[in-house]
Amino acid sequence: MAIKLEDKKAIVAEVNEAAKAGLSAVVADARGVTVGAMTGLRKEAREAGVYVRVVRNTLLKRAVADTEFSVLNDVFTGPTLIAFSNEHPGAAARLFKEFAKGQDKFEIKAAAFEGKFLAANQIDVLASLPTRNEAISQLMSVIQGATSKLARTLAAVRDQKEAAAA
């Protein structure tokens, strides 16, 4: 089915806006995945703040041409499913990684983060990034641990001085 030029321009503009707003991108091949499974993936993507779209490769190359995701141009072959993480850099990678566990035919091709190309075997690095809340809780536990250690040290010094004075 042929797409009209106006529709192509609209698709390129929409994907370009998503790419400019995106923190990371993940590209996959979804051949053989059922419609029901893809609908479930799209629903999970909306909930996770991830923009997911199947786009023709030539349109996709034009859409990401002036963005940091142009490093993915070489993997735009065959049916291409692209996902842009809008809220957290690892959201799309985590979503696709979890989805691939239940779908044998779903193949993650590559990802891009901060203008760097990540091959399919490097997706785990991006997927394992902590979310904002996880990172804050990790930071707070480090700060709390250091503060309590300082308090115990000061108490020990005080106790030593009291013992020496007595």
Curated annotation (Swiss-Prot):
Q: Which UniProt keywords apply?
A: Ribonucleoprotein, Ribosomal protein, RNA-binding, rRNA-binding
The answer to whether the entry has keyword rRNA-binding is: yes
Q: Does the keyword rRNA processing apply?
A: no
Any single Pfam family the record assigns to this protein = Ribosomal_L10
The GO terms describing molecular function are:
large ribosomal subunit rRNA binding; structural constituent of ribosome
- PROSITE patterns per record: RIBOSOMAL_L10
CDD domains the record matches: Ribosomal_L10
GO CC, one annotated term: large ribosomal subunit
Gene Ontology BP terms = translation
By sequence similarity, the record places it as follows: Belongs to the universal ribosomal protein uL10 family.
Q: How does it assemble?
A: Part of the ribosomal stalk of the 50S ribosomal subunit. The N-terminus interacts with L11 and the large rRNA to form the base of the stalk. The C-terminus forms an elongated spine to which L12 dimers bind in a sequential fashion forming a multimeric L10(L12)X complex.
What this protein is reported to do is described as:
Forms part of the ribosomal stalk, playing a central role in the interaction of the ribosome with GTP-bound translation factors.
Output this protein's name: Large ribosomal subunit protein uL10
Q: Which organism is it from?
A: Pseudomonas savastanoi pv. phaseolicola (strain 1448A / Race 6)
Q: What is the lineage of its organism?
A: Bacteria, Pseudomonadati, Pseudomonadota, Gammaproteobacteria, Pseudomonadales
Encoding gene, per UniProt annotation: rplJ
